């Protein structure tokens, strides 16, 4: 509204100036010349500001001489005309002064508007600087995300190399298992020889063997307690990993919400800038229209010519400033468009990252399904404890009862063991892993009187059934290993062949290290891998010691040799291939030659550089050991 009023005032002032110069320019010089011709004293009276008094004029005329009344009338008429002209000129001069004052006021108003526009421009520049700072922060966050992805790729490579080493170790463990089976067969042969020799032994010798079998069962109980503790540790570590994953997911959601808020604020500021630019363009168009109007010719004898020139110069200067502001606004609009494009790209990237995180969460849920097997294993361990109690009761009764009662009890025991040995045949491939962790089998009870042929035949049949059961369990273990290997291979292949992900955003082994983690996640994963190597070396040392003990027992059979069921149970516990990743590794594990491999050295170095990391991670080694060797 203020600009329109100024524009109207300028137009009215210009019209008044035109009318004034059109009216007064041709008349004023003619009147002046005529007055000069008639009487030379009239300009003096005009400059003095009034006409001569009648008395003076009369006296002047009397000095010259007597004149007629007609000449007096002729002289009075031009004086009156001159007085009227002087009055009109004074009125016009006052009007011109008023117009000059109004122009000065308009000039002040224009200057005030220019100051306000300068302030608005300064505010816009401040907003632009803030936008640039926000863009720089977004770029820094983008670089941080790229570094996190690079660290995840590096840890993925380490895990792939470690999986290769673990596959080699798996082959070594399978070889150890074959050697143990041979030792077990040798022990079974020795037991058969012992059974033949026991026909001539006394009852005291059998009681001594029963005592040793009880001791062996106590050892098996200790092993079961250790397995239970390991299961509990695995469950605790699994819960810690789940909490870690949830914390990372919450942090990513917070980052996404902050980014969305910043984008909304940037959009609002952009809209405000666009409105300001439109207002400036409107004001510029109005000023251009004012400049385009033709100016009236300047009067030669007006005293306000200098002020009008000054006003013109100021108007030209204002027009130049407005043009520069228009150029700046155009540049700002271009920058805003580029910023909008960058913000859209960042929104798309963030949306893709959200989709990837959701996919990873779904994959983690799918990979967490096999962990339900641990509950089944706990139930089976409870059932094995009950069986051990039953075996104890049966062995206490064997010393007092007859051969027939002992054979009947052995048949019942074999039936119960058959039921426990094959719990998952009708439930598909998901329950096959529970058969690999079967309860330790008790030593077969030896009857008191082996002199009869029927007792010997029943005892041999019992041993054959035990051997058949052990072979069947081994076959099922192999089937479970193949099934789990194929399943892991499919999942890892799906994660690695994912479009756009390229194994960057997918964490190997159940997603324990996700993409939103900080730089310490790489050291944490390396420490977990180093602890896993140490624990697995302990496992290999235990296998070697057990193998040496089995060979010694096969070469030197004696009354203190372990029963075949003990070795079978130990073999089954050895085939669990599941180790808790604790930092309390023994000295024998530290001296394992497998740590000298090139793939294990960088992991151990990262673990030494970042102590304390990896103590809370949980990665079951049986999952990593059965991963396929993926060639690049």
From Swiss-Prot:
Entry keyword Coiled coil: yes
The entry's keywords: Coiled coil
InterPro entries: GM130_C (IPR043937), GOLGA_cons_dom (IPR043976), Golgin_A (IPR024858)
Ranges where the record places region Disordered: 1-72, 423-445, 504-524, 552-573
Protein name as annotated: Golgin subfamily A member 8Q
Biased composition (Gly residues): 508-520
Family, similarity comment: Belongs to the GOLGA8 family.
Coiled-coil boundaries: 86-148, 270-411
A single GO cellular-component term on record: Golgi cis cisterna
Comp. bias (Polar residues): 38-50
Transmembrane segments: none
GO terms, biological process: Golgi organization
């Amino acid at each position: 509204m203020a600009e329109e009023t100024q524009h109207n005032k300028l137009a009215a002032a210009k019209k008044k100036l035109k009318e004034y110069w059109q009216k007064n320019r041709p008349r004023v010089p003619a009147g002046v010349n005529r007055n000069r011709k008639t009487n030379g004293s009239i300009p003096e009276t005009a400059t003095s500001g009034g006409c001569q008094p009648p008395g003076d004029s009369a006296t002047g005329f009397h000095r010259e001489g007597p004149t007629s009344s007609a000449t007096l009338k002729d002289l009075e008429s031009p004086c009156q005309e001159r007085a009227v002209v002087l009055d009109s000129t004074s009125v016009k001069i006052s009007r011109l002064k008023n117009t000059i004052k109004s122009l000065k006021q308009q000039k002040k108003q224009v200057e005030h508007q220019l100051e306000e526009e300068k302030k608005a421009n300064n505010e816009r520049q401040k907003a632009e600087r803030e936008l640039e700072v926000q863009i720089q922060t977004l770029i820094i966050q983008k670089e941080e995300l790229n570094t996190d992805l690079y660290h995840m790729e590096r840890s993925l490579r380490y895990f792939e190399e470690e999986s290769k080493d673990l596959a080699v170790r798996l082959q070594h463990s399978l070889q150890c298992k074959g050697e143990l089976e041979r030792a077990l067969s040798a022990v079974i042969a020795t037991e058969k020889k012992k059974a033949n020799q026991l026909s001539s032994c006394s009852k005291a010798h059998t009681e001594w063997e029963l005592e040793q079998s009880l001791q062996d069962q106590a050892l098996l109980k200790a092993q079961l307690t250790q397995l239970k503790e390991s299961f509990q540790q695995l469950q605790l570590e699994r819960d810690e990993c789940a909490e870690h994953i949830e914390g990372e997911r919450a942090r990513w959601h917070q980052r996404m919400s902050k980014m969305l808020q910043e984008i909304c604020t940037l959009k609002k500021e952009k809209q405000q800038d666009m409105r300001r630019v439109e207002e400036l363009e409107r004001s510029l168009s109005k000023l251009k229209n004012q400049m385009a109007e033709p100016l009236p010719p300047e009067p030669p004898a007006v005293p306000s010519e200098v002020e009008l020139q000054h006003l013109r110069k100021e108007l030209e200067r204002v027009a130049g400033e407005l043009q520069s502001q228009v150029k700046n606004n155009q540049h700002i609009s271009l920058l805003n468009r580029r910023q909008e494009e960058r913000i859209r790209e960042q929104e798309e990237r963030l949306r893709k990252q959200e989709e990837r995180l959701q996919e990873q969460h779904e994959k983690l849920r799918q990979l967490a399904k096999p962990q339900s097997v641990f509950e089944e294993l706990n139930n089976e361990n409870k059932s094995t404890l009950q069986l051990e109690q039953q075996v104890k009761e049966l062995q206490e009764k064997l010393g007092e009862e007859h051969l027939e009662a002992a054979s009947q009890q052995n048949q019942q025991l074999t039936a119960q063991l058959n039921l426990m040995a094959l719990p998952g045949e009708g439930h598909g491939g998901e329950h096959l892993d529970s058969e690999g962790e079967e309860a330790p089998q008790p030593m077969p009870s030896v009857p008191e009187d082996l002199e009869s042929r029927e007792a010997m035949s029943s005892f041999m049949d019992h041993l054959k059934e035990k051997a058949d059961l052990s072979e069947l369990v081994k076959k099922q273990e192999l089937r479970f290993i193949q099934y789990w290997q194929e399943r892991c291979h499919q999942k890892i292949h799906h994660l690695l062949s994912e479009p756009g992900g390229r194994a960057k955003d997918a964490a190997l082994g159940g997603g324990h290290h996700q993409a939103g983690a900080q730089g310490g996640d790489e050291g944490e994963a390396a420490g977990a891998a180093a602890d896993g190597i140490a624990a697995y070396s302990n496992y290999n040392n235990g296998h070697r010691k057990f193998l040496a003990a089995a060979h010694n027992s096969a070469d030197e059979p004696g009354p203190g040799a372990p029963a075949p069921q003990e070795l079978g149970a130990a073999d089954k516990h050895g085939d669990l291939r599941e180790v808790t990743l604790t930092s309390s590794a023994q000295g024998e594990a530290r001296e394992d030659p497998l740590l000298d491999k090139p793939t294990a050295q960088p992991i151990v170095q990262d673990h030494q550089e970042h102590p304390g990391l990896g103590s809370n991670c949980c990665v079951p080694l049986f999952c990593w050991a059965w991963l396929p060797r993926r060639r690049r």
